């Protein structure tokens, strides 16, 4: 859908070339030579990425946002990349995988999470979270909101999701 709307494109550069184009916090980035690739060509390449026709790193799907944004995360971020390794659960079903910044908002939206609570290091990611949601949101559904907070460390209390899950799975607590 994003490719059809002209809001994403398949980039065929190396990860090093993409990184070099990002610019710096004080200098805008430069556009990929593939940024204006025809929609039909990007759709065809993306289908081939999904089918496993390419090696890891040959192509990525990037959002088409702005290479001059003051927020470097908004400079045409990678959304999907090819990974040619079996997944622990789905094995070889999938050949492409989404990047965290895309998946974060998308999964919150699908699961109808109203508020995504994140620690402060995610504050720069909020613009991207909101941009992604703007592309997929259905006005009749809940639109998630990302909110950041300072990390809270409590003494003698477990708050880590991983540690809590381990306690539940180990049968030490229920929940």
Model feature map: region roles:
Residues 1-146, 153-159:
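Active-site cores that bind ATP or allylic diphosphates and position pyrophosphate for catalysis
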Residues 161, 169-175:
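Short, intrinsically disordered, charge-balanced linker/junction segments flanking boundaries
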Residues 165:
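A C-terminal cap/extension of S-adenosyl-L-methionine-dependent methyltransferases
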């Amino acid at each position: 859908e994003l490719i059809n709307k002209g809001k994403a494109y398949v980039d065929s550069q190396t990860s090093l070339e993409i990184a070099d184009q990002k610019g710096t916090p004080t200098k805008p980035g430069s556009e990929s030579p593939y940024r204006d690739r025809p929609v039909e060509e990007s759709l065809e390449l993306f289908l081939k990425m999904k089918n496993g026709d390419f090696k890891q790193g040959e192509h990525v799907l990037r959002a088409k946002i702005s290479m001059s944004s003051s927020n470097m995360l908004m400079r045409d971020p990678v959304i999907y990349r090819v990974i040619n390794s079996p997944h622990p659960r789905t094995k070889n079903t999938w050949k492409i995988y989404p990047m965290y910044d895309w998946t974060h908002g998308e999964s919150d939206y699908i699961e109808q999470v109203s508020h995504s609570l994140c620690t402060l290091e995610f504050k720069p990611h909020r613009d991207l979270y909101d941009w992604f949601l703007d592309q997929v949101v259905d006005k009749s559904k809940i639109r998630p909101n990302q909110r950041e907070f300072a990390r809270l460390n409590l003494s003698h209390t477990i708050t880590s999701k991983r540690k809590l899950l381990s306690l539940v799975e180990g049968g030490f607590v229920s929940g």
